[in-house]
Amino acid sequence: DTVFQGAHQFPDAVGRISRLCLALEVIPVFVPPLEHGMQNTIESFNGLWQAKVWQRHRVENVHELQACSDRYIAAHRARTRMATEAAPARRSIPENFNLNLHAPLRGQMIFIRRTDETGQVHLLGQRFAVSPDWLHRLARCEVDFDHHCIRCFALRRRAPAEQPLLTTIAYHRTDKPFYGEL
């Protein structure tokens, strides 16, 4: 979605929501679309909601759909309460916060990507070489705007705690003006 990642046809584009996250020192994480697994919780939830609400219930109007959805979401929250309570506390946006969409980017963005047949990943509208030995596998790519680099780590479903560094890529993003509104 361009609101988050920026216009896909332009290299190095960063959208307004990602800029908001970076300004608030929150690290945006992007997972590959339609990729199954723990790293894609929202895609999994959307699939569950469609199966349990949208496809299961026949409703006459949007109010009935909202009621079915509310019941499902309440049940889902009850089932996942322990995990939610164990998550880090959420912070409020500071009252004096003023978003400057034109400020230079600071902090990090993380992209979970699957390498292609040559060991490259596609992110920020570009291809980056990760490893010729890591083909068709998941990699965590940390774009560090402060240190001007992209660090790529191997991800394995069988050993999620082991994430060896595959490569560090020099990355100098020129500060481009932001086009658009909040």
Task: Place the predicted regions along the sequence by residue.
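A non-catalytic, amphipathic alpha-helix used as a structural packing/dimerization or gating element
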Residues: 67-71
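C-terminal, beta-rich DNA-binding module of retroviral/retroelements integrases
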Residues: 73-182
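RNase H-like DDE/DDD metal-dependent nuclease/strand-transfer catalytic core used by mobile genetic elements
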Residues: 1-64, 75, 161-162, 167-181
